[in-house]
Amino acid sequence: MTPEEVLEEFRSAGALLQGHFILSSGLRSSTFLQKMTIFSDPARTERLCRALAEVITARFGRIDIVVSPAIGGIIPGYETARHLGAKAIFVERDPGGPFTLRRGFSIPAGTRAVIVEDIVTTGLSARECLASLKDEAGEVVGAACLIDRSGGRGAIGLPLLSLVTLDIPTYAPDALPAELAAIPPVKPGSRALSKP
């Protein structure tokens, strides 16, 4: 799947939005990728995650376990794992706390794992996911996402693969360009849902 075909999946689903958005990182942007619109369509999700699995296999070879950060990474992680013939697990956070691996999930010695995300903006969720796995016996070989909107700057401490890399500008709330500041902001993300 080419980068243009990936973006067309988002456009045709109405998931490539323009406006003034408050991202889950707290940064602001004029562009938002509404991945839950994508994930509500099983056929579209299957196409994208099959392509991601192909990219992962080409770079990392055998993968035994896909680890995803809850909530946004669970669907693409599961579907990508299905195409890899791997197990799908996830990390989750207690309200206000770090990600942890619970529910009996583990990465045993001798296994190869990859972190799968939906969209990477700053890389924070993937970094926090990786930090939560530091005591696991298996090897976390890399990370992958559908779209890296950081322009390749979302450093997570592992190789990061994506179907598309975009350089979508983000801004601190006190450093908005005038044209963005003139539009009332909306917060479509989910990270704040876990905060009290």
Swiss-Prot record:
EC class: transferase
Cofactor annotation: Mg(2+)
Alphabetical list of InterPro entries matching this protein: OPRT (IPR023031), Orotate_PRibTrfase_bac (IPR006273), PRibTrfase_dom (IPR000836), PRTase-like (IPR029057)
Highest taxon of the lineage: Bacteria
Catalytic reaction annotation: orotidine 5'-phosphate + diphosphate = orotate + 5-phospho-alpha-D-ribose 1-diphosphate
Residues binding orotate: 121, 149
Pathway(s) where this gene product acts: Pyrimidine metabolism; UMP biosynthesis via de novo pathway; UMP from orotate: step 1/2
Keywords: Glycosyltransferase, Magnesium, Pyrimidine biosynthesis, Transferase
Protein's GO biological process: 'de novo' UMP biosynthetic process; pyrimidine nucleobase biosynthetic process
Enzyme Commission code: 2.4.2.10
Keyword Transferase belongs to the record: yes
Binding site for 5-phospho-alpha-D-ribose 1-diphosphate: 117-125
GO molecular function terms noted in the UniProt entry: magnesium ion binding; orotate phosphoribosyltransferase activity
Pfam families (alphabetical): Pribosyltran
Matches recorded under PANTHER family: OROTATE PHOSPHORIBOSYLTRANSFERASE, URIDINE 5'-MONOPHOSPHATE SYNTHASE
Family label: Belongs to the purine/pyrimidine phosphoribosyltransferase family. PyrE subfamily.
NCBIfam families to which the protein is assigned, alphabetical: pyrE_Therm
Subunit structure and binding partners: Homodimer.
Its job: Catalyzes the transfer of a ribosyl phosphate group from 5-phosphoribose 1-diphosphate to orotate, leading to the formation of orotidine monophosphate (OMP).
Protein name: Orotate phosphoribosyltransferase
Name of the coding gene: pyrE
